Each structure stands twice: as C-alpha cells, then as structure tokens.
Amino acid sequence: MPLLQGLSMYARLVVSLPALLRQQDTPEKGLALLRERQQSREANLLRLLERAVYADPRSPYLHLLRHAGCELGDLRRLVPQLGVEATLERLRAEGVVVRFEQFKGREPMVVGGREIPVRPEDFASPVSAPHLMGLSSGSTGARVSQPVSFEHKGAQRAVRLAVRQLQGVLGPPRAVIVGTLPESSRFGGALDGGGAGNLPERWFTPVLSPPRVPELRFRIAHRFVVAMARLHGLRIPRPEPLPVAEVARVAHWAVDAVRRRGAAVVQATPSMALRIALAARSEGLDLGGVTFTTGGEPLTEAKRQRILDSGAQVICSYHMKEAGMIGAACVRPSGPNDQHVMTPHVALIQGRREVIGQPVDALLVTQLLESSPRVLLNVETDDFGVLEQRRCGCPLDALGLHLHVRDVRSYKKLTAEGVTLVGSDLERVLESELPERFGGSPLDYQLVEEEDAEGFTRICLRISPSVAIADEDAVVAALREGLRRASISADLAFRLWNQSGAIRVDRVAPPMSVRGKLFPIQSSRREAAARRGAGSS
C-alpha cells in the first residue's frame, strides 16, 4: 500500500473508531433496521449502483453493464418493475457476472472477447473508504488484502445482535475462537457491540504451526483498537493462544459456564467445534447446554452428528469475507446447513455453469449496503447450493426472511491424469464412510492434489497418524468403493488414477487453515500460494 494512502487510512481509523465504540446498539434497534432494509431493497440497490458503479469510471462493472447495453436509466425502470432478484437474473443472462477468480484478481475479465486485467482493489467502493486492511485466509489461493470498514461494521452490528437474540444465543457466557489482525478484524468482539450481553468472556486465538508473527503494522493496529475499546469501558478479554492439542480448555470453560449460568456459547469454525466436541468426549465431559455458533466452512452432516454426540447443539451461518453474513442459521432447519438469506443486506441468485462437464448452480451475491468497502454485483462465491422459498416458522421467518440457502458446498475439484472430481462426490466418503470403518473423525482424512518431482499430478490421501490402520491399501479400496457408489464419473476417475499410480497415502495430520478451517479436499498449489501470500504480506 502506498505510504500516503496508508497514512490516510490510519487517520480515518483514529477519527472513526471512537464513534463506533460509542454507538449504542440493541436487538430492538437491529430488528427495526432489518424491517426497514427489507422494505428498501430496491431503492438501496439503485442508490448503490448509481454512486458506486455508474459514477465511478474505473468500476469493472461498467465494462459488463455497457457491453450488455444497460444504463442506469434502464435499471431505474427494471428494478421497480421486476424486483431485485429478477433484475439480477436478467443481468446475469446478459453476461453481467464476475467469476470468483476474477474478483480475487487471479484471472482477467473477458468482455466482448477482450481481456481486461483486474485486481481485488479495482472492486473497492468509491463511497466507503476502509479503516484497516486485513488478509484473506488463503484457503482458495494466495492471500489478498481485505478492507475493513468501521462504517460497515456499524451498519451491521445491531442486526447481528438481533439475529443472535432470535437464534437464542445472545446472553449466555460466550467464548470466541478467532485470530488477531490480519487473520481476523473481530478484535475479540470489541466491535460487535458491548451491550446486550454480547462481549465474550474468553478469547482464544488458534496457534498455527509453524507460528506466524504478524507484521508490525497489524500488531500496532490491533493493540490500538483493543486499547481504545477498553478506554471506552468495554472489558475485552485478553487473547489466549490455543494450540490444537489443548482445545479441551475450551470444553472445560464451557462446562463451567453452563454450571454457572445454565448455558454457554462457543463461536468457532465447524472443524474447530468438532475438535472441541471430540476432546470433551475423550475427557468424559458432557457439553449439554453448550451451543456452537459456526461459520466459515460447511457444517456437514458428519460434523454435525459428532458435535451432537457430545451433548452440544450447533448452528451454522454462511459468510463471505467481502459480503459479510449471507445466510443466518435457521433454528428450524431442514438440514445441518440451512440458512435464511440475509435479504435486507444481500441478494443471492444462481447461475448455471459447467464444472468438468457437470452443471452446477453457482451462487452469485450482490451487496445492497452502501457502507460495504467492496462493491459486489453478481459475484460468484465459489459455492453452489440450493435456493428455495420456504416457510419454516422460526423467528427469522416471521421477519419476512423466507428465502433459504442450504447444502452449500464449494465446487473445488481435484484433477489428475486429465480426470476431475467435484468435491461433493468426495465429501461423504471422507467425512463419514472412512471414519466409520477405520476410526478417527472427519478431521483425520483429506484428499490433496499435488505435483511430484517430474511434474505429474498426483492425488494424496492424508490420514492422521492418530488413526491406527494396519492396511493402507484397504483404505484406498474403501475410498474407491465409496466413489463408485457416489457417481459413474467418480468411479471412472478413481479407476484411472489408481491404474496410473496417481494415488498415494501420506500419514500426516491434515492441516487446518489460518482461521481454523479444515477442508476435506485441498490443493498443494493452493497451500503453497497461501504460504507465499502470507510471507509477502
């Protein structure tokens, strides 16, 4: 970041932070905002397009919109006539779509046969300047800068309180498992709103291996924000390093909190929640009264069941770093990964695309809040899932949030010997069938796409050394059998890989990402890119 730009950003930080810390938010205020924004979606979308797209000659979206022959006047006519989602569907059909890799700056946009190079910062909003810069997790490639806007946090804070109250997780003692800058801009809950019992009691920070020391600029910014929060009377807990081998500490805290107050809430990724649940069971702890609020990765049925076996409850929300909360966990879900789309803040539609010859309904997100530091207009999320209108009868449904998104999965894929598998074919086998047959948990198995010394792509099945396996070939055979049942294409892919020697077993523990996520499918190239991004950040 250029020096003057950085100084300007930190000046905004010093000026804006006290106002955010003084902001009084309540669940009642959040409910009022939800109703107001739900009623104003069309006006909010048009205002955002006018100020952040059509008024900005550098906006990448202008290339797409003008190639589609769409001017602001056309949208002013279409949006009231068709509604938000139908208008976005019309734009998608005309090619107004930004692919996930383009939004991350890894591929150029192609408009009318012409390549247009783009960077992540090209999608910055001209009407909402950032106050801090964090970094993405790097789980899908090299880490990129993530702008943090206090204005945007302030616009969502009361709403988050309202959602937590409706989900029944506002008030009990809470522990958060999040990092510090640049991994997370949560500051241990300092900016989540100090009222309504929302401050966490404990703040655990995952310890990476090997340890990573944040740059000086991140350490200074982090300490400044936390110190200012404490000066404003917010009793933010001190971060406690949490190695993976010591996650039972969280379970012991939760059991004690239930004893003291009757309930406890732990905020973590699904993978971290599963680790805590397994640690509790191994130590004979009953997590009855504990609720895990999760996000950042899908809550699969296998993870959910293992967590429930500990006595705890678990809900999962759908987040995207650039868009915020896309889906809020339904408390009367149709499955483990069922959320109410936060339609007051975002619009979510689907676009059919081909992934290795198979059609998937990719999710496209549009941000409706003008306070967002990134402009998102029909941006692919790298996920697919099911969108449906459903009346579930839960408190969020009563607010008019009838659009649900469920069964969200990434269409990450493994490719070797010219044959590719979509991740959904592999997930059930890795997370359910192999642990049931050979022991361990969904955290102990992972498939990785890698290159050998000669440049051939190979598939590595990682199995944690903690799982006692006498015959590794039996695991490979079980993997093949599971894929044979999954689909014809999965069976054919595995047969070819096995025949060409493209599969090997590695007895190492599958690593978690910087935010405590564990993906059952990974690419060594993505891992290497993430490490390079971390080193150059």
Predicted ranges, named:
Residues 127, 346, 506-508:
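Short loop/turn microsegments at loop-to-beta-strand junctions
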Residues 122-127, 340-341, 501-503:
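Short loop/turn motifs at secondary-structure junctions and domain boundaries
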Residues 4, 8, 12-21, 36-310, ...:
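Active-site phosphate/ATP/adenylate-binding loop shared across adenylate-forming ligases
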Residues 138, 353-354, 513:
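Short, acidic, Ser/Thr-enriched surface-loop or helix-capping motifs
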